[in-house]
Curated annotation (Swiss-Prot):
Biological source species: Shigella dysenteriae serotype 1 (strain Sd197)
Annotated family: Belongs to the IPP isomerase type 1 family.
Protein name: Isopentenyl-diphosphate Delta-isomerase
Physiological role: Catalyzes the 1,3-allylic rearrangement of the homoallylic substrate isopentenyl (IPP) to its highly electrophilic allylic isomer, dimethylallyl diphosphate (DMAPP).
Enzyme Commission no: 5.3.3.2
Keyword Metal-binding: yes
Molecular-function GO terms, alphabetical: isopentenyl-diphosphate delta-isomerase activity; metal ion binding
PROSITE patterns reported in the protein's UniProt record: NUDIX
Length: 182
């Protein structure tokens, strides 16, 4: 995969430039554009993934299915599709927006900061997973209700962005729609 960049943003969310992804994530990470996605299978189960230990931020942490950064000129939806193929080896249904104005800042235990305008999407797949070990060290298909109970009881066991997304009332309602079989 070619070198990825992040799209830097000003406080109003207007693009101001780009920076190489690895170099962008530091103790002083500038605001940038990202996305987060929640992937459901044909049984209505959610895919939760454990980030590879080689990840710069939050290595080894359980999180939602796929996260990433759209590239210059790429839509968020196309970025979700690209990263699902790269990280999970799957084709997905067109991503649906479930929390379009999500924005957060969080610092991991090693001092690396995430500072993102991060629209949240959900999609479905019927493909068998082909996990990229450079991105994902473990995964589990789970009932959404069980995951939400786990987040409510032990938020420290999950990525902060997953917790913030899952505790948003409207996002929970929209995620629940993906548990219905189609």
């Amino acid at each position: 995969m070619q070198t990825e960049h992040v799209i830097l943003l000003n406080a109003q969310g207007v693009p101001t430039g780009t920076l190489e992804k690895y170099a962008a994530h530091t103790a002083d990470t500038r605001l940038h554009l990202a996305f987060s996605s929640w992937l459901f299978n044909a049984k209505g189960q959610l895919l939760v993934t454990r980030r590879a230990l080689s990840k710069k931020a939050w290595p080894g942490v359980w999180t939602n299915s796929v996260c990433g950064h759209p590239q210059l000129g790429e839509s968020n939806e196309d970025a979700v599709i690209r990263r699902c193929r790269y990280e999970l080896g799957v084709e997905i249904t067109p991503p649906e927006s479930i929390y379009p104005d999500f924005r957060y800042r969080a610092t991991d235990p090693n001092g690396i900061v995430e500072n993102e305008v991060c629209p949240v999407f959900a999609a479905r797949t019927t493909s068998a997973l082909q996990i990229n070990d450079d991105e994902v060290m473990d995964y589990q298909w789970c009932d959404l209700a069980d995951v939400l109970r786990g987040i409510d009881a032990t938020p420290w066991a999950f990525s902060p962005w997953m917790v913030m997304q899952a505790t948003n009332r409207e996002a929970r309602i929209r995620l629940s729609a993906f548990t219905q079989l189609k």
